[in-house]
A protein has these predicted regions:
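Ser/Thr-rich, low-complexity intrinsically disordered terminal regions
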Residues: 18-137
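C-terminal motif of bacterial Sec signal peptides marking the signal peptidase cleavage site
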Residues: 14-16
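Bacterial N-terminal signal peptides that target proteins for export
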Residues: 1-7
Length: 137
């Protein structure tokens, strides 16, 4: 009986070593999923205010604004941390009800494919948009 005890415990030991991995939006095989993770809709028609909120959010996340074009609705920023990340954010008015914000990040020539980067950006932007839309200073 003692010879079989280690064999019985082996599956439990292997399960205990399992780890979770971040969501890789490029490996999912669909551009639709990537677009959903990289895009948020806001119930406002104020594109200039949304652009200001995006700029403030990028600065709060330690990005340096490289270029902003209000007419095109694009903002490009770079963060110099352990690596250089470049993020481009596009703000587009959709219909008569909302504004769409899409972010796209790159490290060097490689697209950032983990969902966490975009979730972190939009978590801060969501708060900034809420405060701005509700006129909280």
């Amino acid at each position: 009986m003692n010879r079989f005890t280690p064999l019985l415990l082996m599956p439990f030991l292997l399960v205990g070593c399992a780890t979770t991995t971040p969501v890789d939006i490029a490996g999912s095989g669909t551009q639709l999923l990537a677009r959903q993770i990289q895009t948020r809709q806001y119930d406002t028609l104020d594109k200039p205010m949304t652009m200001r909120s995006v700029v403030a959010t990028l600065q709060d996340l330690a990005f340096t604004i490289d270029q902003a074009d209000a007419e095109l609705g694009t903002i490009t920023a770079t963060r110099y941390h352990q690596y250089t990340m470049r993020m481009t954010v596009t703000v587009v008015q959709r219909g008569n009800e909302r504004v769409s914000v899409r972010s796209n990040a790159r490290i060097g020539e490689d697209a950032v494919t983990d969902a966490e980067t975009y979730q972190d950006f939009f978590a801060v932007l969501d708060k900034a948009m809420f405060l701005t839309l509700n006129r909280v200073d």
